[in-house]
Amino acid sequence: MDNNSTLNNITITVASSHNNTTTNSNNNNNNNNGSNSNNNNEQLNTLSNSITSLKSLNISGSGVITNNSEVNTPSEGNITPLPLLSLSDALSPLRELYSCLYVGDIRALMSNQYLKFEENEKIRILGFPEPHLEIDEKTQKYFSYQIIEFESDEDILSIAKSFEQYSQLILGRTPTQPVVIQECCFGLVLASIYFIKYELFSLPQAHDLIGYNDFFGTSKKHSHFEKVDSCTLINDITSYYYNNMSSKRKTTIFSNNISFTNLQTTTPPTTTTTTTTTTTTSSSNNSEQIESTSKNNSSGITSPTSIKPKNKVGLLKKLFNKMDKESSNNNNNKEKVEKIKEKKESKKEREAREAKEEKEREEREKEHQLALKNIPPAELYKHHMEQIQKIQKQQIAELNATSPDGGNDLSNGSNGSKNGNNNNNNNNSNNNNNNNNSNEPNSQHQNHNPITNLMDQELIENYDDGSDRMKNSKTIISPNFESLPDEYKTMVKTWDIKQESVDEHFEIILSLLHFHTKQRFYSSDPTNLPDKPKYYNVGNVCGNCTPPMILDPAGSGQMVVAKSFYKRPFDQICKKPTNEMKKLYTFREKVGKGGFGTVYLVRNNMDKSKSRIAIKKLPHVRKKEKKFNVKEIRVLEFTNHPNIITYYNSHMLHDEVWIAMEFMEGGTLAEASNQYPFQESNIAYVAREVLQGLAYLHGIQLVHRDLKSQNIMMTTSGEIKLIDFGLCANLSKGERIRMCGSPIWMPPEMIQQKQHGYTCDIWSTAICLLELANRNNKLRKNPIKTMFMVGSEGIKDPFEDPHKWSDEFHDIINKCLQMDPHKRPSAQELLKHPFIQLADNKKKMGKILSSIFLKSIVGI
């Protein structure tokens, strides 16, 4: 027997049993159940067993489950009452998108009468009006229903009116008041994200972006709307609506009504007063209901109870039909063209194509073999340069072929002139030439080409592999540029640095070559130079770094002076693997990947207070990896501050280390700077939180040394925390001289391979704040050239729009970007700067960050 038949039999059994034992039943019920009066005990036993089986099957949502208060009336001794469900039990069958945000069938949820929540617990539901849904008075207090209803779908602006309240409902959820989105409404919520993403929190802005009657223009009244194509925006909304919502809604309601029809047609018509969802008395009425519901659903975004005239088609429907036809026509045309090409292709052409593919495979294999061989870095660099130029030429040729105007703009932009094209094709020959004038067009081309712009950054990450061949490489002595080997001169010329600057700051060029290749470069014989100490006396470079005050780790609740950092044995803080690791954690999804490892969202099965955590998986094979992993775990285990990510534990598994820490719902500063134009008060808030974390680190004699926008986490509740401590150093012995960190954020003393201390983090903080102010950071365009500029002269013009910002902001940035590290203020001194007093409060910042990361919150 299928589920629908089982439910139907139970419904009839309850009705007949109840009508046979109740004196106030009507005549129809008495007639229908008169033949069953002698079988009450047998029916009640059957009912009890069926309810128990239904509970194990977790059947729900068809609107036929009977009212349990009346089911238990006849003979309470023979029936075991179902256990009451808590909030977590009621939410368990639903699909969790993010913390406290679920999608599922609200009919089954709201018709469940076995609910027992705590006093302050309530489920907030977002969905369409449900005309057939009747909530029992006992469970009504557990729900708050937000109805999605639009006056008309003729105008996209009428839809935009309600987006703000829906987003605020989602953002305002808590563990005690989670939000459940009706399954068929999920597509509409996805569509609203596009408006929230472009800050459409008011109707005038929606008017300005989309226009009153023209849906194919682009508004440029607001600077952050310039790149928004309103036509694409509407198409995206329409696609999401019809793909994710309309079909689901039709299927859901249609299947529910079909189940009603099956129930009514398989048994004699019986009126059941005990069901929470009212059913009709005949199959013909159900058919009419199905037909009317389908008409309502086919009319676009509208209330299920309203029916649109046949001759009136909604705007979204028109747009979707047009887009659907265009896409189908394009697909058909593509298939036809491909078939014609296949027919026209001769045997000789097919052989040539196969030979070309074989050659490409051989080249890829050759590149792989080259990477494995013990070859000098310069040769590997040359090989990669050739591959990059080859890919670059292919992409330019493809773009020129597909461009509607023949690609003239692209050609002019990349080559400058017809002669510039020849320079581009003969790039290698020009690079081997010492004539700098012949290489200038190429340099300009590289600055404007995204492939070449990212080349230096890619090489920096790929060549710093820490292998033994780098350490055992020979020392190169070169007093000037002309005495460098040819392969390194070629490398320097690709950096787009003027020759007079190269000659003037040749020591910095040697430092950059060392950073690039891990070869040792000297301008004179190192045996004649005095030995450099590994550590330098800290002196005044650290500033006035007094030990910070923190909450007592023992739990007394009092503020105590933090102890200086000390190393604990690694085997005491990193647990060994156990056979129950799978029972401890359930991995859900990958949420991030960096240069050191991969981060996963994980459910902690043993500790419900820390149910959602993040686990960072780090390779633990090479000596360099082990060094960084041990350092990061020691720092995380020792630190205890609100602006530093919370550490839970770590595990050693084979050739990996797992670090378990708090999961931060939000994103990085780098992600936020690309999605939102931060105001000065917002930037001051970020500066204050970062400086508080640095003041704590410096107070316990630690320096981060890899502070960048990707290592600053921001949460939807307004928290700012520092992460990634693999390069963190203990300065209790003195300053370091090692060149490390990321190019854009590296201070000048580190680029010059001089001693560095706490104030290297101050420089990096200023660069992060400039990312928020400038957004399109010009420092990223050429990382190596930026490093040379920082090492030789610093950053002279930090702001792209200096008139936009206050004198306080200019002052704090100028103090942080002092070339002399001794002149930079400490983190504690900067916290007293007037700029910090402009900071927003945490509540306001939480709302801003929530709107920034709303896209990830709803799971798209």
Swiss-Prot record:
Region (Disordered): 17-45, 264-378, 401-450
GO BP annotations listed: regulation of cell differentiation; sporulation resulting in formation of a cellular spore
Alphabetical list of InterPro entries matching this protein: Kinase-like_dom_sf (IPR011009), Prot_kinase_dom (IPR000719), Protein_kinase_ATP_BS (IPR017441), Ser/Thr_kinase_AS (IPR008271), STE20_Ser/Thr_kinase (IPR050285)
SMART domains to which the protein is assigned, alphabetical: S_TKc
Enzyme Commission number(s): 2.7.11.1
Amino-acid positions noted as binding ATP in the UniProt annotation, renumbered to this chain: 591-599, 616
Domain of life: Eukaryota
Biased composition regions of type Basic and acidic residues, renumbered to the chain: 321-370
Compositional bias segments (type: Low complexity): 265-281, 406-439
Gene3D superfamilies the UniProt entry points to: Transferase(Phosphotransferase) domain 1
Active site residues according to the UniProt entry: 706
Record's protein name: Probable serine/threonine-protein kinase mkcA
Organism: Dictyostelium discoideum (Social amoeba)
Gene behind the chain: mkcA
